[in-house]
A protein has these predicted regions:
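Alpha-helical bilayer-embedded segments of polytopic membrane proteins, i.e.
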Residues: 210-252, 275-280, 330-345, 356-397
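Transmembrane alpha-helix/helix-exit interface in multi-pass inner-membrane proteins
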Residues: 393-410
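Cytosolic juxtamembrane N-terminal segments of multi-pass membrane proteins
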Residues: 191-209, 341, 345-349
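N-terminal chloroplast transit peptides
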Residues: 1-25, 29
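Membrane-embedded catalytic scaffold of the fatty acid hydroxylase/desaturase
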Residues: 3, 244-357, 408-494
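B-type heme-binding environments
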Residues: 2, 34-202
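Long, hydrophobic alpha-helical transmembrane bundles and adjoining juxtamembrane helices/loops
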Residues: 179-191, 235-238, 248, 258
Length: 495
């Protein structure tokens, strides 16, 4: 039996969000889900009882929009830190990659992607996510593979279990799991995972991950051209300047996203582009965003779906987290306008993160950016362009995830989770340019280091691969996706 509760799942089962019967079903589902999690916690040795199960604390703040989110640890807390505390009581932090278990205990703090990822993946097969986030092969960088080869090998997670626990957990991820609970350690890649590895190798051999200098130059020139035009118009045509700079900031955000995901000397050299153009810390963003890629739509781990108290993407009775009915009932009306503050909040987190880390390089780049922003531009144009850019990014960046399946546990392998949590947008021309690669979100999530200008050509290849293996490749028009997001917020506003 697997417990995986989400508003979408309840809707699919024919449960309407109103009425006492629906409320009873939601409450029962919430109690069942929390009971499963608490039962699992009792099977893990800990120095003292943990009192921070889901529902006892406010939980993770919104990494995406909340002004209260901390700038460190990718802005993610995990179920009141219960899961993290469970992992830390173990003797080793171990991941399985390509069939081998590696002891990552000593490496966790030095991991460029942050220690939180290794802590949460402890005891799991990380093969697909490792290769997704670290390029390799003829068009990539083998740094991560070389570092991996230097790590000590070890046995599986059963080494750290007591005799009683071993009886409960010995089959997890293979053929059995604790009664009534989802798999905690999913460590057996199936046929689809092997086929996905073959697909990635095919793309590598055929050069899909290589950067095209002409296309790179065209995208960069277009983005900088919008900045130049806005700067030129700032003194005489402030509204046009604000729109031009806002568009430029949106496109610069997409471009910085490409550079940080990408590998090779060009992307490494352009890593600070987001700091210079938008005031974004590459280090802060990378940690936050890699958590999203690794744990897409997994409640308590993916900060991009944890937006309370500003937005409720799930029924509070299901999550067990505090409700705010006064705000929630209006969220479908203020939701989209509030996205305008996305960039302002990302900027705040970026400065706080760079300052806390005493990162002199990033602080210098941020200083150059803010000197230009507030000395070369009128104040109204500077602030207005941040709001325009923030709205254009915020309204699109998570639209393809928020109404898809939200999972309470990491049930399934990396590829399976991406198909369940992601929808693509069917757009062309100017509309595709505005989406900046977010329209091919599933392609991007499966192959994050692939340049976005190759996504549309890769889409039919992946669609065929998915159809042959029974995966649901979801794609809708942008109007349908944005409407679906509005209706989802409205449905949760009226529960």
């Amino acid at each position: 039996m697997r417990v995986a509760v989400s508003p979408a799942g309840l809707a699919a089962a024919g449960v309407v969000a109103r009425g006492s019967a629906a409320a009873q079903i939601r409450r029962a589902a919430a109690v069942a889900a929390r009971s499963v999690r608490n039962d699992r916690v009792r099977h893990v040795a800990a120095p003292a009882p943990d009192t921070t199960a889901r529902g006892d604390v406010a939980g993770p703040r919104a990494a995406f929009l909340s002004p209260f989110a901390p700038p460190d640890v990718a802005d993610v807390d995990v179920d009141g830190s219960t899961a993290v505390k469970e992992k830390r009581t173990k003797k080793k932090l171990r991941l399985r990659i390509d069939g081998e278990w590696y002891d990552c205990t000593g490496w966790a703090k030095a991991h460029p992607g942050g220690s939180m990822f290794i802590t949460l993946m402890d005891g799991c097969d990380a093969t697909d996510v490792f290769y997704a986030l670290h390029s390799y092969g003829p068009n990539g960088d083998d740094t991560a593979a070389r570092r991996l080869a230097m790590l000590p090998k070890c046995g599986g997670p059963e080494e750290d279990l007591t005799e009683g626990e071993e009886a409960v957990f010995s089959g997890v991820g293979r053929s059995a799991s604790p009664p009534g609970a989802p798999h905690t350690f999913d460590v057996s890649p199936g046929e689809a995972d092997a086929a996905f590895a073959d697909l990635r190798k095919k793309f590598e051999r055929e050069g899909w991950f290589a950067r095209d200098p002409l296309k790179e130059a065209a995208v960069l020139a277009t983005t900088l051209g919008l900045y130049g035009l806005g700067w030129f118009l700032a003194g005489t045509h402030p509204i046009l300047a604000t729109l031009s700079l806002g568009l430029g900031m949106q496109q610069a955000g997409w471009l910085a996203h490409d550079y940080i995901h990408g590998r090779g000397p060009w992307c490494a050299a352009m890593r600070g582009f987001g700091a210079l153009t938008n005031g974004f810390s590459a280090e802060w963003w990378q940690h936050k965003h890699n958590m999203h890629h690794s744990f897409t739509n997994i409640d308590g781990r993916d900060g991009d779906i944890k937006l309370e108290p500003l937005y409720f993407l799930q029924d509070p009775e299901v999550t067990g987290r505090p409700d705010n009915p006064a705000m929630r009932k209006w969220q479908h009306w203020y939701g989209y306008p509030l996205y305008a503050f996305t960039y302002a909040l990302w900027r705040r987190h970026s400065v706080a993160s760079a300052w806390a880390r005493k990162d002199k390089t990033e602080l210098a780049l941020l200083a150059v950016h803010y000197t230009w922003l507030f000395t070369a531009l009128p104040l109204g144009v500077a602030l207005g362009s941040i709001l325009v850019g923030g709205f254009l990014v915020g309204s699109l960046v998570t639209a393809t995830h928020q109404t898809e399946e939200i999972m309470f546990e990491q049930n399934g392998q990396f590829v399976d989770i991406q198909f369940r949590s992601t929808r693509e947008a069917d757009v062309k021309g100017l509309e595709a340019w505005l989406w900046g690669g977010m329209d091919t979100q599933l392609v991007h999530h499966l192959f994050p280091t692939m340049p976005r200008y190759r996504h549309h050509d890769a889409r039919p290849v992946i669609q065929k691969w998915a159809e042959e293996r029974g995966y649901d490749f979801r794609i809708s028009t942008s109007g349908e996706i944005l409407g679906k997001n509005f209706n989802h917020l409205k449905e949760l506003a009226h529960i």
